[in-house]
Amino acid sequence: LENPLFGTVLDVWMSLRGDAIAPPWRVEDLLRYPVIVIPFISVVDVTPNGGFRYRFWGTGHVDVKGYDYTGHSPLDHEPPEYGRMINDEYQAVADAARPMAFVHDIRPGLTEISKYQETLRLPLANDGRTVSGVISFA
Protein backbone atom coordinates (compact mmCIF):
# COMPACT_ATOMS: atom_id res chain seq x y z
CA LEU A 1 0.00 0.00 0.00
CA GLU A 2 1.29 3.42 -0.91
CA ASN A 3 -0.57 5.65 1.55
CA PRO A 4 1.68 6.22 4.61
CA LEU A 5 -1.41 6.82 6.76
CA PHE A 6 -2.30 3.11 6.59
CA GLY A 7 0.51 2.36 9.04
CA THR A 8 -0.74 5.06 11.40
CA VAL A 9 -4.33 3.76 11.23
CA LEU A 10 -3.14 0.21 11.90
CA ASP A 11 -1.05 1.40 14.87
CA VAL A 12 -4.07 3.15 16.43
CA TRP A 13 -6.25 0.07 15.87
CA MET A 14 -3.61 -2.17 17.49
CA SER A 15 -3.32 0.14 20.52
CA LEU A 16 -7.12 0.07 20.95
CA ARG A 17 -7.42 -3.71 20.71
CA GLY A 18 -5.05 -4.62 23.53
CA ASP A 19 -5.22 -8.39 24.07
CA ALA A 20 -8.58 -8.81 22.29
CA ILE A 21 -8.92 -10.07 18.71
CA ALA A 22 -10.09 -6.55 17.82
CA PRO A 23 -11.13 -3.37 19.61
CA PRO A 24 -14.79 -2.58 20.30
CA TRP A 25 -16.59 0.16 18.40
CA ARG A 26 -16.72 3.32 20.51
CA VAL A 27 -17.40 6.72 18.97
CA GLU A 28 -14.82 8.35 21.22
CA ASP A 29 -12.14 6.01 19.84
CA LEU A 30 -12.72 7.46 16.38
CA LEU A 31 -11.05 10.63 17.67
CA ARG A 32 -7.84 8.71 18.34
CA TYR A 33 -7.30 8.37 14.60
CA PRO A 34 -5.56 11.29 12.85
CA VAL A 35 -8.03 14.06 12.00
CA ILE A 36 -7.02 13.84 8.33
CA VAL A 37 -8.24 10.21 8.05
CA ILE A 38 -11.61 10.50 9.84
CA PRO A 39 -13.49 11.79 6.75
CA PHE A 40 -12.28 8.68 4.88
CA ILE A 41 -13.34 6.16 7.52
CA SER A 42 -16.42 3.98 7.29
CA VAL A 43 -17.78 1.55 9.87
CA VAL A 44 -20.12 -1.36 9.26
CA ASP A 45 -21.95 -3.40 11.87
CA VAL A 46 -22.56 -7.12 11.45
CA THR A 47 -26.36 -7.44 11.34
CA PRO A 48 -28.32 -10.19 13.13
CA ASN A 49 -28.78 -12.03 9.81
CA GLY A 50 -25.02 -11.98 9.16
CA GLY A 51 -25.04 -9.10 6.68
CA PHE A 52 -23.48 -5.67 7.06
CA ARG A 53 -24.91 -2.18 7.56
CA TYR A 54 -23.02 1.12 7.52
CA ARG A 55 -23.02 2.81 10.92
CA PHE A 56 -20.63 5.58 9.85
CA TRP A 57 -19.79 6.90 6.39
CA GLY A 58 -17.17 9.66 6.44
CA THR A 59 -17.77 12.95 4.66
CA GLY A 60 -14.70 12.39 2.49
CA HIS A 61 -16.45 9.36 0.98
CA VAL A 62 -19.49 11.53 0.26
CA ASP A 63 -17.25 14.08 -1.48
CA VAL A 64 -15.47 11.45 -3.61
CA LYS A 65 -18.32 9.04 -4.31
CA GLY A 66 -21.27 11.40 -4.16
CA TYR A 67 -23.36 9.24 -1.80
CA ASP A 68 -23.94 8.83 1.93
CA TYR A 69 -24.38 5.14 2.67
CA THR A 70 -25.02 5.54 6.41
CA GLY A 71 -27.78 3.06 7.30
CA HIS A 72 -27.37 1.14 4.04
CA SER A 73 -25.90 -2.24 3.17
CA PRO A 74 -22.70 -2.52 1.11
CA LEU A 75 -24.89 -4.44 -1.34
CA ASP A 76 -26.66 -1.13 -2.09
CA HIS A 77 -23.57 0.18 -3.93
CA GLU A 78 -23.87 0.57 -7.70
CA PRO A 79 -23.17 -1.18 -9.92
CA PRO A 80 -24.34 -4.39 -8.21
CA GLU A 81 -21.04 -6.23 -8.84
CA TYR A 82 -19.21 -3.46 -6.97
CA GLY A 83 -21.60 -3.84 -4.03
CA ARG A 84 -20.99 -7.59 -3.96
CA MET A 85 -17.22 -7.07 -4.07
CA ILE A 86 -17.34 -4.64 -1.11
CA ASN A 87 -19.64 -6.97 0.83
CA ASP A 88 -17.26 -9.88 0.14
CA GLU A 89 -14.35 -7.81 1.49
CA TYR A 90 -16.24 -7.18 4.73
CA GLN A 91 -17.09 -10.87 4.95
CA ALA A 92 -13.44 -11.85 4.45
CA VAL A 93 -12.34 -9.55 7.29
CA ALA A 94 -15.14 -10.82 9.56
CA ASP A 95 -14.30 -14.46 8.80
CA ALA A 96 -10.54 -14.03 9.27
CA ALA A 97 -10.89 -11.67 12.28
CA ARG A 98 -7.78 -9.80 11.15
CA PRO A 99 -6.91 -6.65 9.20
CA MET A 100 -6.85 -6.92 5.43
CA ALA A 101 -5.96 -4.52 2.62
CA PHE A 102 -7.66 -4.30 -0.75
CA VAL A 103 -6.85 -2.41 -3.94
CA HIS A 104 -9.43 -1.79 -6.65
CA ASP A 105 -11.06 0.71 -8.95
CA ILE A 106 -14.13 2.55 -7.76
CA ARG A 107 -16.80 4.03 -9.96
CA PRO A 108 -18.67 6.73 -8.05
CA GLY A 109 -21.42 6.71 -10.68
CA LEU A 110 -22.32 4.37 -13.49
CA THR A 111 -21.11 6.87 -16.09
CA GLU A 112 -18.06 8.25 -14.26
CA ILE A 113 -14.41 7.34 -14.79
CA SER A 114 -13.04 4.77 -12.36
CA LYS A 115 -10.68 5.86 -9.60
CA TYR A 116 -7.87 3.87 -7.98
CA GLN A 117 -8.51 3.13 -4.28
CA GLU A 118 -6.54 1.39 -1.55
CA THR A 119 -8.57 0.29 1.47
CA LEU A 120 -7.53 -1.00 4.88
CA ARG A 121 -10.30 -2.94 6.64
CA LEU A 122 -9.96 -3.82 10.33
CA PRO A 123 -12.30 -5.95 12.44
CA LEU A 124 -14.14 -4.68 15.50
CA ALA A 125 -15.21 -6.94 18.37
CA ASN A 126 -17.49 -5.43 21.00
CA ASP A 127 -16.98 -8.44 23.29
CA GLY A 128 -13.29 -8.82 22.41
CA ARG A 129 -13.87 -12.28 20.91
CA THR A 130 -16.49 -12.10 18.14
CA VAL A 131 -16.31 -9.78 15.13
CA SER A 132 -19.20 -7.33 15.43
CA GLY A 133 -18.15 -4.85 12.76
CA VAL A 134 -15.41 -3.56 10.48
CA ILE A 135 -13.75 -0.15 10.40
CA SER A 136 -12.23 0.88 7.06
CA PHE A 137 -9.91 3.62 5.87
CA ALA A 138 -9.72 4.35 2.15
What is each model feature region?
Residues L1-H77, R84-A138:
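Intrinsically disordered, low-complexity terminal regulatory regions
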